[in-house]
Amino acid sequence: MIYLHAIDPIAFSLGPVKVHWYGLMYLAAFFSAWSLGRSRILRGRLPGVDMDGFSDLLFYGMLGVVLGGRIGYMLFYAFETFVANPLILFKVWEGGMSFHGGLLGVLVACWLWARKHRLHFFDVMDFVAPLVPLGLGFGRLGNFVGGELWGKFTQAGWGVIFPHAPELADQLPAQIQAQYAAGALNQLARHPSQLYEAALEGVVMFVVLWTFSMKPRARYALSGLFALLYGVFRFIVEFVRVPDAPIGYLAFNWLTMGQILSLPLIAVGLALLAMSRRAPVLQPVLPTPAGVEAAK
């Protein structure tokens, strides 16, 4: 049944402060990363690092996600707007985050943290890779709740009518509701591409990576698998997702910025998986009893 999107993006209010679902999804993402990371630390998946060290790594990662995601969005998707008004970079409440920018931010953050702790960069990235997909899934759910980043038109029974889409933006909620009840808006249903990405980049990637990480793997393998899966899934979903308005299609009337940015990920993923075939396997080293107590 075609669904009319009518979810309030505001979860609740505390006096004058309005708490948005998207912000809560970020909290859920960081909590899931902490919980999964704690489990991996207790199983010795990053030898020599205790919970204090992991908490430090998570803080670095959070900064990388937020700063990289925002800067990446400005550079990849709103560069002209940014050049005209550089201060818009700080208006995070207006929305605008890029996964690929966030990924670059996390890479820089993990490199700095690995250098600080004298660890191999890819040992750190292999540790982090299984912690990320659930956060991606929560982020896409936040996009859906916010009614943004919708897909192309579809007549599939699970299509969603988004009131903030251009074709309905000038109508009042009561008008939209009346037309929906009469079945007059069915032709305006769109692919819920946010949910497709939540399922693929969130659930599927988490199950695959977490299962794969249960046994010690060669260096580069987990990082390579993450990059490959994300690149492929994002490239596919872009075919049913409306391209970002300021940019549109970049070539062939179908190639999007998201697809162009995903191609290097696919190539890097394949290269890392090839490198892993000759790389050493990082054997787990269980933390000391004191470290286990500190994690409780």
UniProtKB/Swiss-Prot annotation:
- Which Gene Ontology molecular function entries are recorded, alphabetically? phosphatidylglycerol-prolipoprotein diacylglyceryl transferase activity
Q: Which family does it belong to?
A: Belongs to the Lgt family.
Q: Which residues cross the membrane?
A: 10-30, 57-77, 92-112, 119-139, 194-214, 220-240, 254-274
Q: Gene Ontology terms, cellular component aspect? A: plasma membrane
Keyword set includes Cell inner membrane:
yes
Q: Which EC number applies?
A: 2.5.1.145
GO BP term, example: lipoprotein biosynthetic process
**Name of the protein in its database record:** Phosphatidylglycerol--prolipoprotein diacylglyceryl transferase
Pathway involvement? Protein modification; lipoprotein biosynthesis (diacylglyceryl transfer)
Q: Name one Pfam family in it.
A: LGT
Q: Which InterPro entries match?
A: Lgt
If you read the UniProt record, what top EC class would you report for this enzyme, in one word?
A: transferase
Methyltransferase listed as a keyword: no
Q: Which UniProt keywords apply?
A: Cell inner membrane, Cell membrane, Membrane, Transferase, Transmembrane, Transmembrane helix
Residues that coordinate or bind a 1,2-diacyl-sn-glycero-3-phospho-(1'-sn-glycerol): 140
The protein's topology relative to the membrane is: Multi-pass membrane protein
Q: What does this protein do?
A: Catalyzes the transfer of the diacylglyceryl group from phosphatidylglycerol to the sulfhydryl group of the N-terminal cysteine of a prolipoprotein, the first step in the formation of mature lipoproteins.
Major localization listed first in the record, in broad terms:
membrane
| Organism from which the protein derives | Xanthomonas oryzae pv. oryzae (strain KACC10331 / KXO85)
